[in-house]
Amino acid sequence: MFCMKIRVATYNIHKGVSSIRAEPRVLALKQAIGLFNADVVFLQEVQGKHDLKAAKYGAEQLGQKHWPAAAQHEYFAGESRHLHAAYGMNAVYDHGHHGNALLSAFPIANMANHDVSDHAYEQRGILHCVLNTEHGLVHCYVVHLGLFEAGRRRQTQALISAVRESAPDGEPVIIAGDFNDWRNTLSGELRNALGVVEAFDELGTNASLDGIMRTLRRKASMKATINPARTFPSALPFFRLDRIYVRGFKVESAEVMHGSLWAKLSDHAPIVASLTLG
C-alpha cells in the first residue's frame, strides 16, 4: 500500500512589500519560502505586475530592495524545487495586477481561476490547480476571501460549489489561504459541506481525552469549536485568518512560522504542514 508524504505551506506575502517600511522584500521572500522545504506553496497577494515599483526599485544594485522584472510567482519558482507555477489574476489596475499563486514540485495538469469578487472594491479569486503526483491527482485551491463577513459567506458558498464541481469524491483536496475569518465562523461550514479538516484542529483530535470527546461530539452532530492557529498580525499573532484544510490526508504536523524574520516580511505569518496520503 502506497503512502505519499507531502509538505505544504500557505502565505499571504503582502504583495512583496515589507509590512513595516513598505519597501520591497521580494528577494528575502524567495529565500524565506525556500525555508519551508515545502512541495506545494499556496500564496496570496502575489504581484504579477507593478510598473511603479519596477521603475523605482528595478536597479539590481539596490540589493535586497531590488524589484525583479519577472512576475513574483515566476521569480519565486525560478532556480528552486518548485519547477511549476500557476497564477490567478484577481485585482487589475493601471500600473499592474495581483492575485493568488501556487508553486509546486509536481506538474500542474490543469488550472482554473474562479472570480468570487463580491463587490467592485475587492477583487477576490479562488485558484484551482490539479497536481499530477506519482500517486494520482491532488486538487489544490488557493483562497483569499474578502474583508466583510456577508461577502465571505457568499464566497465560501462559491468555494464549496467549486470543489464539489471540480474534485470528484475520493480524490484528495487541499484548500489553503487567507480566509479573513476574523470571528472563526467558516470552518464548521466547510467541514460539513466538503468533509475537510483544518490542519491544527486535526492535530488537536489526536490528543487523548480531548480528541476522544471532540470525535464523539462530531459523530453526535453536536457543535465542536474548531481552533485554527493565530497568524495575524505576524509580529504578534492574534487572529486566526490563515488556514489549511485537507480531505483524504492525515495531518502529521503543522506550525506557524514565528519570529523577527517573518514579522519583517509580511503582515501575515505563514503556516507549514506535513501531510500523509494513503
Predicted regions and their residues:
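Active-site regions of metal-assisted phosphoester/phosphodiester hydrolases
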Residues: M1-V40, P68, H82-G278
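Flexible loop residues that form catalytic
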Residues: V46, D51, F249
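Charged, glycine-enriched surface loops/patches
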Residues: Q61-L62, H73-A85
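Short loop/turn segments at strand-loop or loop-helix junctions that form parts
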Residues: Y11, Q44-Q47
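Short, flexible/disordered intra-domain loops and linkers
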Residues: S19-E23, H50-P68
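Short active-site-adjacent helix-start/loop capping segments
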Residues: K49-L52, D94-G96
